[in-house]
Amino acid sequence: MGAGTERAQRFAAEDFARYSATVKAAAEDGTAMLFAGTAMELLGASVTDRDGDTYPGIGLASFTTVQGKRRIVGDVYGVTAVVGFMNKCGQIRGVEAPLLTGLSLGFGNEAEKGPEGFHWKNVFASELTGPVLVKNPRLLEAVADAICTRRGISLPEERPSFPYAEAGYAITAEQLKLRAEARQ
């Protein structure tokens, strides 16, 4: 599930709530899922919008989101060499199992350089916007491995190479790493 505006998110939450039991059961059973951008916020217990109105998430996890009036926009470079772009106005509190343990550059769930995202079983969630998998070969491999493992197969030893995607990742990662080091 991908990102959307905060305004559209409330409508999506109402519709998504109809599937909460199905999504929770699939997650418990090990189905691989990816949530990017504001879609991640819907996995928690609740979202409080900038006007102070609260609406429920699906409750896959107990974290909560509080949206503010200040937008957080910028590049992200994870300690585990994940790259991406973030455009959000929410702080996510109480994530017990983050996808990324820390950031060298950018804003995490609650604070700058803090842990970012959510990971439970085969549910991968990040407030990074797409193309998350194309930009992050290691994350793509983790998601593909989760899909294959659930089906009882292994990723093939020899996989196709995508030199342009790999070069794009390497250039982006190197530039963001240099920017993060310059800020220290």
What are these regions (language model features)?
Residues 123-184:
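Acyltransferase
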Residues 6-8, 65-68, 92-94, 131-135:
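Short, acidic Gly/Pro/Ser/Thr-rich loop/turn segments
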Residues 98, 114-126, 138:
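Long, Lys/Arg- and hydrophobic-enriched amphipathic alpha-helices
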Residues 13-16, 47-51, 73-74, 141-142:
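Short, glycine/charged-enriched secondary-structure capping and boundary segments
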Residues 38-39:
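N-terminal Rossmann-like NAD(P) cofactor-binding subdomain of oxidoreductases
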Residues 34, 59, 85, 124-126:
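Hydrophobic/aromatic beta-strand patches that form the interior of the parallel beta-sheet core
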Residues 50-116:
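Pocket-forming structural segment of enzyme catalytic cores
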Residues 1-35, 44-48:
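Flexible gly/pro-rich beta->alpha loop and the following alpha-helix that scaffold active-site loops
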